[in-house]
C-alpha cells in the first residue's frame, strides 16, 4: 500500500496548524517532500563548501581514537542511516550519508553539544551550552544567540533548541530565572519570552541541571523536562500547566505523532513512552533489556523514534568503550549497534534524515 498521499495530507494539516501558531510557513515545494532533508544533502558537498568556514574553530581529534570496534555488530554500521549527530564530549557536528562522513563543522574546545537539527532548507541549528546558532551548508552563520558566560547571578546556559518554521527558533535559557524564548531570526524580535518556574532556592552554581530537551508540540503547547527536579511538565500556549509526569532525571521529552510522550531518564538508564493519562505503554531499560555484549557505558540521554516504530538510543560512552548508538524494535530486538571511536566520540543527539517529516514543523521529527 502506498501511504505517501495520506502522510502528505497529514503534513499539510500540521503545516497549517503551525503556521497559525507561529505566523510562519514552510514553502510548498519543501512541504510536498516526505523527506526534505535528503533533497538538500548535495549542498554539503558542493564546490563552494570550504574545509573550514570563516567562523569555524579547529577541534582537535577525539580523546578515544584507539577504541576497538567489535566484529559482527548488528546492522550496517555507518551505512544504517543518513544522519546528523553531535556529542557532549566532542567539538564537531557530523553529517553522515551512505556510510561516510560527508561534512563536519568544528566549534573548537568548548562545552557540550545538546541539540541539533537539519532544516528542510539545509541549514543546521544547534545548541552548544554557551550559545545556539544556525549555519548554512557552506558554513556561514545566519543566526547566533550567546549566553552570559561569566559565573554569577547572570550566568545562563542553553541545552535545547528547536526550529519553528524556517524563521523562528525556540530556546530555553537555564538561569536565574530560567526563561523560554521564541526568537524571529530574520528580524531579531523576541516573540515569546516567559519565565519558567523552578522551585529551588536561587543558586548560580545550580543552573546547569535545571532544564534539558524541551519541545513545542503540534498543538502549540510546551513540553519541558525539569531535569533537576524530576518531572516533565506541559504548558499551554499561555504557560498554564496542563500535564505533569514524575520521573527521576528526565533529560529529554519528545511528543510523538501518536500523542504519547517519549521520556529519557538518564539516572535510571530508562526510556519510557507514556500516554496522556500517564500510563506506560512501552519502556526500555538499557541496563536490563540490552544484551551484555551491547551494554552502554554511559546512560542514554536522548532517544529518537523512527517511522517504522524502532527507537534509537544515544550514549556519550566512556573512555572509548561501548556503543554510541543502538536501535531496537518495539519488541526490544537489537537491529543496529554503532561503536566507532575512531571517527566519533560520544553521541548525545541524532537526527535520522531519511525518516518522513519536515523538521521545522513540531512533532514531525521525533527526536
Protein language model features and the residues they cover:
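Bacterial N-terminal signal peptides that target proteins for export
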Residues: 2-11
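Hydrophobic helical h-region of N-terminal Sec-dependent signal peptides
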Residues: 11-18
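C-terminal motif of bacterial Sec signal peptides marking the signal peptidase cleavage site
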Residues: 20-23
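Bacterial lipoprotein signal-peptidase II cleavage site
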Residues: 25-31
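Histidine-/acidic-rich catalytic cores in large beta-rich domains
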Residues: 32-367
Amino acid at each position: 500500500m502506498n501511504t505517501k498521499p495520506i502522510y502528505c495530507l497529514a503534513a499539510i494539516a500540521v503545516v497549517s496548524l503551525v503556521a497559525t501558531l507561529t505566523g510562519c510557513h514552510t514553502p510548498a515545494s519543501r512541504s510536498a517532500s516526505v523527506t526534505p532533508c535528503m533533497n538538500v544533502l548535495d549542498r554539503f558537498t558542493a564546490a563552494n563548501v570550504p574545509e573550514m568556514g570563516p567562523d569555524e574553530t579547529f577541534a582537535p581529534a577525539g580523546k578515544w581514537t584507539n577504541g576497538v570496534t567489535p566484529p559482527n555488530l548488528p546492522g550496517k554500521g555507518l551505512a544504517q542511516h543518513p544522519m546528523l549527530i553531535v556529542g557532549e564530549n566532542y567539538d564537531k557536528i557530523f553529517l553522515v550519508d551512505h556510510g561516510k562522513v560527508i561534512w563536519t563543522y568544528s566549534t573548537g574546545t568548548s562545552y557540550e553539544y545538546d541539540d541539533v537539527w537539519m532544516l528542510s532548507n539545509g541549514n543546521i541549528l544547534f545548541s552548544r551550552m554557551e550559545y545556539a546558532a544556525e549555519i548554512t551548508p557552506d558554513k556561514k552563520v545566519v543566526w547566533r544567540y550567546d549566553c552570559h558566560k561569566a559565573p554569577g547571578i547572570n550566568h545562563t546556559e542553553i541545552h535545547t533548541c528547536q526550529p519553528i518554521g524556517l524563521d523562528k527558533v525556540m530556546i530555553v535559557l537555564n538561569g536565574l530565572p530560567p526563561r523560554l524564548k521564541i526568537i524571529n531570526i530574520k528580524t531579531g524580535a523576541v516573540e515569546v519570552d516567559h519565565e519558567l518556574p523552578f522551585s529551588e532556592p536561587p543558586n548560580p552554581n545550580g543552573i546547569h541541571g535545571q532544564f534539558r530537551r524541551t519541545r513545542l508540540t503540534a498543538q502549540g503547547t510546551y513540553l519541558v523536562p525539569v531535569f533537576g527536579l524530576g518531572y516533565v511538565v506541559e504548558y499551554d500556549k499561555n504557560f498554564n500547566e496542563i500535564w505533569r509526569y514524575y520521573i527521576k532525571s528526565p533529560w529529554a521529552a519528545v511528543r510523538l505523532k501518536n500523542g504519547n510522550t517519549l521520556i529519557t531518564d538518564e539516572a535510571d538508564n530508562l526510556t519510557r513512552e507514556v500516554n496522556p493519562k500517564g500510563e506506560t505503554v512501552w519502556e526500555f531499560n538499557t541496563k536490563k533489556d540490552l544484551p551484555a555484549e551491547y551494554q552502554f557505558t554511559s546512560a542514554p540521554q536522548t532517544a529518537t523514534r523512527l517511522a517504522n516504530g524502532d527507537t534509537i538510543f544515544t550514549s556519550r560512552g566512556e573512555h572509548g568503550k561501548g556503543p554510541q548508538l543502538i536501535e531496537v524494535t518495539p519488541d526490544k530486538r537489537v537491529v543496529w549497534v554503532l561503536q566507532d571511536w575512531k571517527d566519533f566520540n560520544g553521541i548525545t543527539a541524532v537526527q535520522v534524515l531519511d525518516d518522513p517529516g519536515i523538521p521545522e514543523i513540531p512533532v514531525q521529527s521525533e527526536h
